[in-house]
Amino acid sequence: MLNLKHFRCTFDKYQNFKMEVIHNISNYFPKKPSIVTIGTFDGVHIGHQKIIRDLVSKAKSEDLTAIVLTFSPHPRMVLQKDTQLKMIDTLDEKRQLLETMGVEILIVQPFTQEFSRLTAIEFTRDILVNGLNISKLIIGYDHRFGRNREATVDDLKQFGLDYNFMVDEIPAQDVASIAVSSTKVRNTVLAGEIKKTNQYLGRPFSLSGSIVKGDKIGRKMGYPTANLEIKEKDKLRPNNGVYLVQSHLNNKICFGMMNIGKRPTVSGKKIQIEIYFFDFEGDLYGNKLKIELLEKIRDEQKYESLERLGNQLSIDQKSCQKLIPKYL
């Protein structure tokens, strides 16, 4: 089971730390040599976290600037025209995660067709050496870079010798002998396998957005819900169903149950996200909210009446509350 207390303690270390975010590498002007890692870091999963921890630790011990170079949009959206690709984290969620891990500078490089045509040697010389004043590069075991992903880790190590920087290669991080990747994380979310998702992420998968007014059907059944609206269209959503969730409300953790789906019992037409908190009273309309998913309870179903649906919600609440002690 995911140890949430350990996760909170680990990330609270940099709770008041402020990371600088720079859009486009041309806007960065090095003040001292840097230690850099490169990637999309979608999900910032446990493999990414190993790289980031090494980056921050070595930056401190070697007096280097800790830089994460990432790309937006995701290269697949540009190179493969993959308009269906959904992101595990929004750019802002990624920013928050990297900041809590102690990264000094996040450079968000616009990924364009022109940028993708840089050869490996051009990327090394123009971006890493001249642009970032690199002293050390930390990368994952499967990293490839340059036009058409032409260069490997071994190529990078040779470039390091040529341009006088070190290259540290980080091995795969496993969960139950399975190498973790963003694709594996994405697949578990889509399958509703949230417990496995959270193992891969080392933290709860989350959804963030604004609370908007709904049609108050839940309130009529005794289950007033907060309706979450996510503005980012490419944000990954889990498959339809009921989930045990938690959120930080009024400086404390509140548990609840979330339904994501079209609400077939009331002939809903579009996907909606509704959360009922067990021990919270108050008006959340207009607030920004981050919902952390802990476990899936069941798939979405259609019921003959609102009364039948209400009975099922009571069962769902009891199922959720039995699970809560595991997360305290």
Regions found by a protein language model. Name each.
Residues M77-Y141, F145-Y163:
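N-terminal Rossmann-like or analogous alpha/beta NTP/dinucleotide-binding catalytic cores
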Residues G160-M257:
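Glycine-rich, Lys/Arg-enriched anion-binding loops that position phosphate/diphosphate groups
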Residues I25-T90:
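N-terminal catalytic cores of NTP/NDP-binding nucleotidyl/phosphoryl-transfer enzymes
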Residues G214-L328:
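Phosphate/ribose-recognition catalytic cores of enzymes acting on nucleotide-derived substrates
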Residues H45, L98, L137, T197, ...:
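Residue-level signal for inorganic ion chemistry
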